[in-house]
Amino acid sequence: SCPDGIATLILREVPFRGEGYILVRGVFGTLEGLLAECAGFCRAAGAERLFAAGEADFSGYPAAIRIRERSAPRESLLPAPEAVRLVPVTEETAADWAREYNARFRAVPAAESCSPAEERALAAGGEALWIWDGAERIGLGRVRGGELLAVAALQPGAGERCVRALAAQCTGPEVRLTCAEENRRAMRLYDRLGFSRGAEERVWFSI
């Protein structure tokens, strides 16, 4: 907090890709003053690119990342391809999963990296999965209830098979996820699979 307001600084992506995020909770003075104070702290921590969102009027800043809610009836994504199977991450494969995940999501707007602490918890959580098609490892994913937290193809053209396989792991009548509109390849895949375009969950503005 500072005289101009309150914000949460998200610095976990600074070591991974040099990005800092400022989530504004309230403005008491000016938004410019609050962002300047926060930006100085973020840059001192090593952030090279800064984004802000939250409870404020950001009309003077360019929208950089639009996070969109998407959903589809689970039954419409089934059955999963017959030869495709899901294999839970183990303690022996957790480091490999985290490495592949971080490599695939490094260029995805506003995606969270898998930290060393999260890597150590992957096997125990049961959410992280490898996706195999026969003898070939084609992707990875993370599922929690009816939500796809992550999906990434490791082979060209495997995206649809990965989504369908993970949908089979979901519970409930609907498969939900969020996707940055700027991640155009993923957005096109979800369009093709019949995912609806819901509300904007959050818009990050470049500062």
Could you say what each language-model-derived stretch is?
Residues A7, P62-I65, R137-G139, A199:
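A structural microfeature
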Residues A165-Q169, R176-I207:
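Hydrophilic extracytoplasmic domains
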